[in-house]
Amino acid sequence: MRVARVVTPLVLVAHGSADPRSAANARAIGREVARLRPGLDVRVAFCEHNSPGLVDVLRDCPDRAVVAPLLLANAYHARVDIPSQIAGCGAADRVLQADVLGEDDRLVSVLRQRVTELRVSRRDNRIGVLVVAIGSSDPVANAHTAGVAPRLLAGTRWAAATTAFATHPEPSLAESVQRLRHMGARRVVIAPWFLAPGRIPDRVERFARDAGLAMAAPLGAHRLVAETVLARFDRAAGARIAA
């Protein structure tokens, strides 16, 4: 008799936003994850603002599940918000939380591609790249995020790269642009370390427009973003099996 293989659901949880483009991007990533892994039960949930909520999705999961945060930084939402929602619906004993996407090499590669989509050559040594992230109240999380900029230069001849945080007053975006110019950049472009469009990326885009700078697209529902989600899922699911 053939025994049916139990497939652990992957619950892809995004923070959620009042901007519908953010939720649309999360769902697009969910579809790409499902396309890359046929047969995997992929469900999309949100911490707030959008539906379905994480608690509702977990209550509908028949058994075990892996919650994969669609987050770049290991900060409040990953360490407090999501775990509390898992515990609050009584699912802590059957749900594993995967690691955040973080500063994965695949995502840095996508960011580099987004910059080149601005018709920026990897061999152009005049280029300075300002990586703009949301920022966190956690300095450790910000330090990890700041590591993206120097890694972005790998395989290029770009003059320099540095990081600024959209929610932090210092250094300001304008100050960071000047820093790149002092580092030898003659043309500065902005690389948004965001998964999706939204109100904060729009604010950065307004700055770029006013400053006469080109700004790349967010990471979006790129195949490598979905691959990173699956890598986090596989690691969490594998840890459960090993245990």
Which ranges hold each PLM region?
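Active-site-proximal alpha-helix that buttresses catalytic centers in soluble enzyme cores
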Residues: 1-243
